[in-house]
Amino acid sequence: LSAIKVITDHGAELGLPPMSLEKVTGLFQTNQQSVSNCDKANVKLGFGTDLLGDFHKYQNDEFVYRAELQKNIDVLRSATSVNADIIQKTGELGCIKENALADIILVAGNPLQDINLLSKPGENISMIMRDGKIVKNQL
């Protein structure tokens, strides 16, 4: 959703011609409805964006947009264990257990109650551990 939102909000900056900008009008709402329909039908929904360059800063807005349509726990699962399941890496990724690859983060608050915390990682994530090594520590 965040990639579509960037295209609809910043398409002109991206160099999209007027005809393309017209085509994307309403696309965000259409995609929201698709996510909602999939959620209601218990379709596995992975989590991720393809935002690069100047627009990379908007990628974590996906948490906010998805939480408007799904429960916070389902959005978090989508970003972790569901993604692992989709790429057939259950037990290796998306979980915290011995011999699993995991990024562990320390969040200033409870994303189950306020998922918006994850939309601003620079402000709300004070520690990141990757492969057993701390790669960010602002404690």
PLM feature spans:
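His/Asp/Glu-enriched, well-ordered alpha-helical/loop segment
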Residues: 15-19, 26-111
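Short, Lys/Arg- and Gly-enriched loop/turn segments at beta-strand edges
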Residues: 111-117
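Short aromatic-centered micro-motifs
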Residues: 128
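Active-site gating loops and adjacent loop-to-helix segments of metal-dependent hydrolytic enzymes
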Residues: 1-26
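Phosphate/diphosphate-binding loops
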Residues: 125
